[in-house]
């Protein structure tokens, strides 16, 4: 689930 990473990178 890269979705978690997607939202994480969204912060950046």
UniProtKB/Swiss-Prot annotation:
Record keywords, A-Z: Amidation, Pyrrolidone carboxylic acid, Secreted
Protein name: Tachykinin-like peptide-IX
Major subcellular location class: secreted
Tissue specificity field: Expressed by the venom gland.
Keyword flag Repressor: no
Compartment(s) where it occurs, according to its Swiss-Prot or TrEMBL record: Secreted
Modified residues (Pyrrolidone carboxylic acid): 1
Record GO cellular component, one term: extracellular region
Residues modified to Methionine amide: 12
Family: Belongs to the tachykinin family.
């Amino acid at each position: 689930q890269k979705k978690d990473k997607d939202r994480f990178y969204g912060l950046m």
